[in-house]
Amino acid sequence: MTAVAQKCGPKSVSRPKHWSEEVEEAYRFQCAGYRDAIEYSDIKQKEPERWPHNGYVKKLQRKDGCFVYFDKTRECQDKDVNKTKMYGY
């Protein structure tokens, strides 16, 4: 991903129909108030903490300074899958 893509923002948005690990990743960032991992890294200037065994996001710091903690297992329930936005660059 180039620096130009990061500065301009996403080119497309779609809504997923089925759960996947990419949907889980997006769901966790969006619960904390971020668009995706790219926006989080740009704002916080660091990578998020992840669970070592599966790579899921463990802890995120919201824009107001509070922390959001996530389980080791799936957090995005089937009813929330279509509420998640998948951004394309």
Swiss-Prot record:
InterPro entries: Meiosis-expressed_gene_1. Coiled coil: none annotated. One of its GO terms (cellular component) is nucleus. It comes from the Eukaryota. Pfam families: Meiosis_expr (PF15163). Belongs to the MEIG1 family. This is Meiosis expressed gene 1 protein homolog.
